[in-house]
Amino acid sequence: MESFAFAYKLKNNNQNNKVPHTHEAECHINVWKVDVGTILPKTKLYFDFGLMINSNIEWIYAYIPFDFEENGRDFDLVKKLQNNNQLLCTVFNCDYRIQMGQGDTFGKVMDKEDNIKFSLHQLGSTKFEIIPFYKTGSKKDIVGKLLKIHIQEVPQDTEKVYIRFRIEPLKTTDIVKSEHISNDFLQAAFSRIDMYDLRINEIRNINTDVMDKIKGDNYIPFKFDKVHLFYMADTKENVANGSSLKQDSRLLEKDLWATYLPENCYKRNYIAHHWKKRVKKEDMRIIEESIIETKQLFIPFDDYRIFFTTVYPNIQIVRLFVYLCIVVLLGWCGSMLSFRLSNFLPHSIPECFKLLIVAGMFFVIIVFMIVTSYHLIIKLIRK
């Protein structure tokens, strides 16, 4: 899959200033894999994007490398955070409270000491525009969409602004590579493996038309000081990390996340698998002779990439039917090859000799099982 891309443009009164290209953003991405519906539930993917940006940014480009729908009421997640203070604290894992101002557009988020941490910014239908990008030589096949987001004038005492929105991919095949488990003949009928390779601001994997649009409109790709990615899935799903980033997992609290889940989502236990990227650097300074002070600094980085696989229950009726056909055919072949021992042995051989032949076969099978399981038997005896 192509890379996601996030870029920004400063306010007009800041464009001519010599502002370094280091307006770092903090990026949050939640990937939800949920079952929607009651009688015949259907598995769907949802992507939540959150950006913590400087207040002197006026425009944001967010390129999504697949076709999606904005999801109507569920698009702007800031509304959910403004209406539920407990949910706000849960999402940011801090003890915050919100103070509304300037209508419903902004809400100041404050800590216990009443210090303003940042402002939540709602995204109404007039605050963003969707620009589709098509496959080369086609005017129907959409390969991605560019969200052009307008940040309104923020309160003067606010340094940081936070936006958060949710989208639903129209086709999951554009994002996930799915295969059956090829190294296990039987398990392949009951399980499936999905592969996710998600990238953010990886220049060489961004659509060239999108990069031309970003550069042509004088937007600057974000640098990041921190990126969080969460993959929310059913407890029966096994996630394997394929990245150098550390993975940690926890069980989501049903009562805290109930109002945040996608609409019509089947309520069940979900596990949040988390990957965080933050680049550290040690700064060493000599204070006096033989005295060195070491300070740990966090430096901005350009891109983010994560790869992981998931294995989950998935009964494949066609594959099971094929397996059943194989068993029936083998039984039919066996019955065709069956014969009576009397067809080959003279009738003078007593029945007890035939019994010895059958017993010998069982003896060979038992010996074979013991020999092949020798190491396992030794371990059991030692225990």
Predicted regions and their residues:
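Ordered hydrophobic segments in well-structured contexts
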Residues: 5-7, 44-50, 61-63, 148, ...
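Beta-strand elements of well-folded, non-transmembrane domains
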Residues: 51-55, 68-70, 167-173, 233-235, ...
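Cytosolic-side membrane-insertion boundary helix
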Residues: 262-334, 338-342
